[in-house]
Regions:
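Beta-propeller folds
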Residues: 1-228
């Protein structure tokens, strides 16, 4: 009789447990992507079976073949207490609803070809994680900072919201959409981060090199699809 009661009790609580764990997906790796030479992989994961705040992780092997996992970016470290009470743009909320995305924190990312630069958004802000590699230990040393924060604060009507950011293969630029325009972010340099509006994408650069703008054309197509979804 006790066993039957346990089964009935489990059935009774199953719907709520399934909802609290996002269909039992919390705490499990997701959105994995191999990078570099294929020996490393980026992925997202929260800290527990009922933790909704997802962080960015790296799976890698050392010279002896031992496997390691390193947390690259943690929303709670970047935002503090506000990481548990998200304030995302309406357009991003709509995208998450369509994708049945119930997690918070870092729910998507874009990496360059080497896999050492990754961009993502948290609460509508744009972040960049740079990975340096320790010459002695061979371990990754991640550094995360906000990209172009001053620009976003100076003219939010022009430069926000930050939606669907994608980093260039060489890791030097980021393209995102505001829902109305494409925005190009130049990372770093002597003048710091800079944002410019992209009103058109040419198949050739100033020197007539068609390969230079290939990534922009692809991202423009992705962003166009993203824009149409909100019409």
């Amino acid at each position: 009789m006790s066993e039957t009661n346990d089964v009935n009790d489990a059935i009774k609580h199953f719907p709520r447990l399934r909802a609290r764990t996002l269909r039992f997906g919390c705490g499990a790796p997701r959105s994995a992507q191999t990078v570099g030479d294929g020996s490393r992989a980026l992925f997202l994961r929260s800290d527990g079976p009922e933790d909704l705040v997802t962080a960015l992780w790296l799976s890698w092997f050392d010279e002896s073949g031992e496997h390691h996992e390193t947390k690259l970016a943690d929303p709670r470290e970047l935002l503090g207490a506000t990481a548990d009470s998200e304030d995302v743009p309406a357009e991003e909320k709509a995208r998450r609803e369509r994708a049945r995305e119930g997690g918070t924190g870092i729910v998507g990312y874009s990496a360059d070809d080497d896999g050492n630069r990754i961009v993502f958004t948290i609460n509508g802000r744009l972040f960049l994680t740079d990975i340096d590699w320790n010459d002695e230990t061979g371990a990754p040393e991640p550094h995360t900072r906000e990209l172009a924060g001053e620009w976003l604060d100076e003219d939010p009507a022009m430069y926000t919201p930050v939606l669907n950011p994608r980093i260039a293969p060489d890791g030097e630029h980021v393209l995102y959409t505001t829902g109305s325009y494409l925005m190009l972010v130049d990372i770093g340099g002597e003048l710091g981060d800079r944002i410019t509006a992209v009103y058109g994408v040419s198949v050739e650069d100033e020197d007539g090199n068609p390969a230079e703008n290939t990534w922009k054309i692809g991202l423009a197509a992705v962003s166009y699809t993203h824009l149409r979804a909100h019409e």
